[in-house]
Every structure is written in structure tokens, then in C-alpha cells.
Amino acid sequence: MIFHKNIVKAEFIRRPNRFQAYVKLNGSEVMVHVPNTGRCREILLPETTILLREENGINRKTKYDLIAGYKENKLINIDSQIPNKVVEEALENRKISYFTKYNKIEREKTFGNSRFDFKLSGDENLKCYVEVKGVTLEKEGVAMFPDAPTERGRKHLLELIEVKKSGMDAAVLFLIQMKDVKYFRPHDEMDKKFGEALRHAKENYVQVVAYDCDVGENFIILRDEIKVQL
């Protein structure tokens, strides 16, 4: 997907809470919104070059969203609203081999007590619920999720098992918001219960897949399937 809004570079200073950060822009300290409640500690370091997207909402307190940061020479998108849009574009273009048998895409559909990012439908009553998780954490070429404990994420996995037991297909797709990673694995050191739930989901025939992305200053596109190591 292409970003059509104005994108500018700045320098990260600090992040006092999950929703706000201070950056240096054109020599001045500016408060910006952070559209990601994860920690992003490996990316948002003092003096790191980051990208801001200009926003013009009437009721906004800030003019910019902090959407990406450079980790050495690697640009990593951190906007939590982006993964679903990237995956939807890839689904529409039939770029994800697991889902090419489905021809109808519905967003934000409920099953049981959970709302999933996508419900896919195809011929012969084929149906699949898909949950997308955006991945921003990378260490030594290994992409991991989550970067903060997520009880909600664990519950999604358990509900996907129920989807599968009901006779429909179920999948979780980890969208790695960068390129050049070796493989993906659950971040057990941060959230052991999530890792256990992911392995349990796989054992119960929930599809677990990961894709990386080409990320530029004004675009992000789903790229290649990445090995999942559980």
C-alpha cells in the first residue's frame, strides 16, 4: 500500500506513555501520537531516525503520527493500523497462497466471544476466520511476537481453535513489518502463555503463517512467506 499523506523524518527523543512521544522536528521538540501500544523499545531509542505521517483531524491534539523507525539501516513500520490494510490488499491480489481458494473478504467478523480481522468465504461453503498480528520485534534476524504480554492475543488463538472444531478453517497470520528476517517464533520470554497457546493452536490444525514486508518511507507491501519455528 502507498501512503498518500505527507511523510517527514524526525529524531526520536522520548516516549512518556504508550500514546505519546516527543521528537525533534526541524530543530524543535514536538509531541506526536504513537499508533502502537506495544513497547517498541528496540526501535524507539533516543536519536533514532523516525518517520512521521501528517494528520489533520479536527479533534487531534497532535499534528503527526509516529509510524516507523530505523533500526540501523532497516526501516520498521510500527503503525498498528497498517497490518490489516496490507493483508487485505494481499488477499485481494491473491498473493497469499493459503487463501487463494476464497473469493469473498469480510472485515471484523465475530465468532463466539471474539472478533477476528477477516472472514473469508469461497465456493462449496468454504469459510475461514483469519486473525492478523503485526510484528515489530526483531533480534539477530529473528522476528518475534509479542513485544508485550497480550491476554487478548492468547484468547484469539483459543477462539480460533473453536472455529476449527466447528468445521471451518482458521488461521493466524503474523505480518512482519520489515524485511530480511531469518524466521519467526513466539516471544516466549515475554509471554509464555501466548507461546503455549500458539503451539496448542497449531496442534489443533489452526494455520500459523508469517510474511515479511517491503517497507519504504511511503509504502509497505507484503513480500515473502517466512518460516515459523514453534
UniProtKB/Swiss-Prot annotation:
A Pfam family of the record is SfsA
| InterPro entries on file | SfsA, SfsA_C, SfsA_N
One of the record's GO molecular function terms: DNA binding
Q: Please give the family membership noted in the entry.
A: Belongs to the SfsA family.
NCBIfam families in the record, alphabetically? sfsA
Specify the protein name. Answer: Sugar fermentation stimulation protein homolog
Recall the taxonomic lineage recorded for the source organism. Answer: Bacteria, Bacillati, Bacillota, Clostridia, Eubacteriales
